[in-house]
């Protein structure tokens, strides 16, 4: 991005494999699942399980899933993050805007080094996680904090969350209204957020409360009553208890109770990715169809102008 500004916005998303192949997916999962913020099991016990059991099993399965949603220009998460960054640069011409991934490429630390090489004096880091969690935002904070001593002359701020930001809430609400105008409105609106182990929430992680606040802010903006919507958590991993209600069983119960159509939105995801496109838009729709119900997926804000404008306002207030 061409700008002479000494202030930079660094947009950071979770990450993605470089290709929908087993080796690339295994490399990505190995990095992701080796983060102690993500899996807290001591490495002495976790590494043999990860490399001996989990990666050999999940690598091929995940690669097959990625292949279903891969775009001509790359993974949806990478494509939309790059385009969103370009949109942010257009609405923030007085800042230098770039992007990175917490896992995979472009690597976060390398992006920070690149900004230092440009002579940037102030960096605002914007994790693309509307709701804060120790498993996501804090992991980005860890990398930034480890990098700080190498560039003490640069002021670095990490935005913690924007779960109730008025501009972001309005953008989500507008995207839902637009979807209804184009595709019609279903009987029930479902909010599906990425799950979190219950033990993490019990330890004080504010994520579930922030998800609830996000959902409530959006339904308030839409003017919906309590019977018009439902929320749940998806992407459970492992055998332990995660945040409830679980999204998919909740949808099943509603369908078996007579609800025949659902609109579903994922306000915890800034950009569409494997979890939203394969697990939800394809997977949830398939299991609901088996129960005589339909699901209409509402895309993430992705690279929309309203998304860029909302995030630019968040960054400028940092």
Curated annotation (Swiss-Prot):
Q: Which Gene3D superfamilies match?
A: 3.40.50.1400
Catalytic reaction annotation: heme b + 2 H(+) = protoporphyrin IX + Fe(2+)
Q: InterPro entries from the entry?
A: Ferrochelatase, Ferrochelatase_AS, Ferrochelatase_C, Ferrochelatase_N
Instruction: Give the UniProt subcellular location, in the record's own words.
Output: Cytoplasm
Tell me the keywords, alphabetical order: Cytoplasm, Heme biosynthesis, Iron, Lyase, Metal-binding, Porphyrin biosynthesis
Q: What is this enzyme's EC?
A: 4.98.1.1
| Function noted in UniProt | Catalyzes the ferrous insertion into protoporphyrin IX.
In terms of NCBIfam families, this protein maps to: hemH
Give the family from UniProt: Belongs to the ferrochelatase family.
Query: Which protein, by its recorded name, is this?
Result: Ferrochelatase
Query: Taxonomic lineage per UniProt?
Result: Bacteria, Pseudomonadati, Pseudomonadota, Gammaproteobacteria, Lysobacterales
């Amino acid at each position: 991005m061409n700008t002479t500004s000494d202030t930079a916005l660094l947009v950071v998303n979770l990450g993605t494999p470089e290709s929908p192949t087993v080796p690339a997916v295994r490399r990505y999962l190995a990095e992701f699942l080796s983060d102690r913020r993500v899996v807290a099991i001591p490495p002495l016990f976790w590494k043999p399980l990860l490399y001996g059991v989990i990666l050999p099993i999940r690598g091929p399965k995940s690669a097959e899933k990625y292949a279903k949603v891969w775009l001509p220009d790359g993974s949806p998460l990478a494509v939309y993050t790059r385009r969103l960054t370009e949109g942010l640069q257009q609405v923030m011409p007085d800042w230098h805007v770039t992007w990175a991934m917490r896992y995979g490429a472009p690597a976060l630390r390398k992006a920070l080094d690149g900004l230092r090489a440009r002579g940037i004096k102030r960096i605002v880091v914007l994790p693309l996680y509307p709701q804060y969690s120790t498993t996501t935002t804090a992991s980005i904070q860890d990398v930034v904090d480890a990098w700080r001593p190498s560039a003490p002359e640069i002021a670095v701020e990490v935005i913690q969350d924007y779960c109730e930001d008025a501009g972001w809430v309005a953008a989500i609400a507008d995207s839902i209204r637009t979807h209804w105008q184009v595709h019609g409105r279903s009987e029930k609106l479902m909010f599906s957020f990425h799950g979190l182990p219950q033990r993490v929430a019990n330890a004080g992680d504010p994520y579930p409360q922030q998800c609830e606040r996000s959902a409530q802010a959006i339904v308030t903006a839409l003017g919906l009553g309590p019977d018009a919507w439902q929320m749940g958590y998806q992407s459970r991993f492992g055998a332990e208890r995660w945040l409830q209600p679980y999204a998919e069983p909740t949808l099943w119960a509603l369908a078996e109770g007579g609800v025949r159509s659902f609109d579903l939105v994922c306000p915890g995801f800034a950009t569409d990715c494997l979890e939203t496109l394969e697990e939800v838009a394809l997977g949830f729709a398939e299991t609901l169809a088996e129960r005589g119900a339909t699901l209409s997926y509402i895309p993430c804000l992705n690279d929309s102008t309203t998304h860029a404008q909302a995030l630019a306002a968040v960054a400028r207030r940092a």
